[in-house]
Amino acid sequence: MKKIKNNTTTITNIIASSGSFDIELIESLGTADYESLMEISASLAEDYGEKYLLTKNTINKYFNRSGALPIIARFENKIIGYIIGMPLELLSQEPWVRLDENYGKFNTLYTYAFVIKNDFKRKGYAKILKKVYISWAKKKEGILYNTGHVKSGISKKFKGQIKIIAEINNWQGTGKIFEYYRRNLDPEKIYEN
């Protein structure tokens, strides 16, 4: 895992852009952007509880981790959202992850977090961010699947080959039913060995 020591500057590559809206792949997240990310995570906490608030430690752990796919969305140079993909194997401390049939195969990217600032919801930004994320997940060597936990009923709105693996009551203490889904990123088996 990469560590940031007194690095305030974020290093990114713009991977999609339209006018004042940019989507950036993070190479190294600097401390200057931590506050924005913690503020945005508050909208997750409103829906699911305070454990969904980002901290400096969780930001460093997930945004600056080797193997992760951290992507941010900016509007007029301000961060308005983020999505983080993690190989299942980097989440081995989570009891549920070892039950996934692909655990240990290094072929699955788990969507750890996906959030857009409340003011920017229902304006198409989240949809574009997710499309770019899926596109980049497909480009990661050896990755054939994308998984994640979403509220019950959400995954049926997804495009592509989606399979619900499990339903979990009271996911992570939220009091809500969540689905664990798997998206096949390579249904034509173009990239499979």
Region locations from a protein language model:
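Short, P/G- and charge-enriched loop/turn segments at secondary-structure junctions
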Residues: 58-59, 96-102, 165-169
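Conserved acetyl-CoA-binding loop-helix of GNAT-fold acetyltransferases
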Residues: 113-116, 122-135
